[in-house]
């Protein structure tokens, strides 16, 4: 995944090759699920050019990127953490208005607890917030 945020305008551009879509969270609600990847993972050998996905962020928007190791993290009973639980936990944690690193830390701990503290797959979380337009140079 490659993402670029224009800090002056809030324009987010994303290319993904096999990772799940990102989520845009605004005022406590998921307002956009970024479209799924258009290119296959690099390791599959088939080369399709990725499509650049663009999203206009508003000041205060949060964006959550994650790998499938997050949503597929299984409990002892085999129940996946899932997208719904990911969204619910993230939205509730963001409502606590803690710094984003603390919110991400709590999310990772919730995922680890769900799978009895045994990491079963790659599990990456990136959480960002666009606060306001950057000043012109």
Descriptions of predicted regions:
Residues 1-137:
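Conserved subregion of the PPM/PP2C metallophosphatase catalytic domain
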């Amino acid at each position: 995944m490659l993402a670029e945020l224009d800090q002056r305008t809030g324009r987010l551009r994303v290319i993904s090759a096999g990772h799940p879509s990102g989520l845009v969270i605004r005022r406590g609600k998921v307002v956009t699920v970024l479209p799924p990847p258009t290119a296959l993972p690099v390791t599959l050998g088939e080369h399709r050019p990725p499509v650049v996905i663009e999203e206009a962020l508003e000041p205060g928007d949060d964006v959550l990127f994650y790998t499938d190791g997050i949503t597929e993290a299984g409990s002892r009973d085999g129940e996946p953490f899932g997208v719904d639980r990911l969204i619910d936990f993230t939205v509730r944690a963001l409502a606590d208005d803690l710094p984003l690193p603390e919110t991400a830390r709590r999310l990772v701990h919730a995922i680890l607890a769900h799978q009895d503290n045994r990491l079963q797959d790659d599990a990456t979380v990136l959480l960002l917030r666009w606060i306001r337009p950057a000043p012109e140079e």
